[in-house]
């Protein structure tokens, strides 16, 4: 958060006592974090580390070229990666049905040969179990896993005047 606000301490990815936090700078380009994660994951595999690289994006990020490149690269090299896709049904204000014909965003992982799960993202236990299983699979050298989390957007996408009622019905919001 400090880095995004221009504070110099935000560039220091360590704890207060100087220990590294195993993180990298936030990626501004949507979907590009998947390319970075795939590279880090391949490095972890080559060093035989019991670790995985994680990357997160939302519905819209799965329609970016970098998303496909990262997922495909990680799959081809069986890199130690776990990819999360938060599916709240909208890429900002674009409904999923207008941004992709895929029946589930997890299908985009399947298309690259990656085991992909669809999980109730509103269920903490289901999320924990899916993430734990995915991490074990990837860390064992079996290749990446993609987890699509079905969620609800509880607030507007941004604070820049995004009124969800312009593109969502009250019934849709109340359903959650």
Regions found by a protein language model. Give the residues of each.
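Generic beta-sheet signal
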Residues: 51-55, 81, 141-147
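Acidic, glycine-rich active-site loops and adjacent beta-strand->loop/helix elements
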Residues: 57-63, 85-91, 122-125, 151-153
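Short beta-alpha connecting loops at secondary-structure transitions
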Residues: 90-94, 114-120, 163-174
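Short internal beta-strands
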Residues: 78, 83-86
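Glycine/aspartate-rich loop-and-adjacent alpha/beta segment that forms the canonical ThDP
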Residues: 137-176
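Glycine-rich, charged/polar anion/phosphate-binding loops
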Residues: 67-70, 129-136
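Cofactor-binding active-site loop characterized by glycine-rich and histidine/acidic residues
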Residues: 1-79, 95-101, 106, 111-113
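Conserved thiamine diphosphate
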Residues: 45-49, 102-133, 175-176
């Amino acid at each position: 958060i400090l880095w995004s606000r221009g504070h110099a301490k935000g560039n220091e990815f360590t704890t207060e006592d100087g220990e590294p936090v195993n993180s990298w700078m936030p990626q501004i380009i949507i979907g590009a974090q998947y390319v970075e994660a795939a590279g880090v994951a391949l490095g972890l595999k080559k060093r035989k580390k019991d670790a995985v690289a994680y990357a997160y994006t939302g519905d819209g990020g799965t329609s970016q070229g970098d998303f496909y490149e990262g997922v495909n690269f990680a799959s081809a090299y069986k890199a130690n990666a776990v990819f999360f896709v938060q599916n709240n049904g909208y890429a900002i204000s674009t409904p999923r049905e207008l941004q992709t014909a895929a029946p589930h965003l997890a299908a985009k992982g399947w298309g690259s040969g990656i085991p992909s799960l669809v999980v109730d993202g509103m269920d903490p236990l289901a999320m924990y179990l899916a993430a734990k299983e995915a991490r074990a699979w990837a860390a064992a050298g079996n290749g990446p896993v993609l987890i699509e989390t079905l969620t609800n957007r509880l607030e507007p996408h941004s604070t820049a005047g995004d009124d969800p009622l312009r593109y969502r019905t009250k019934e849709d919001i109340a359903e959650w």
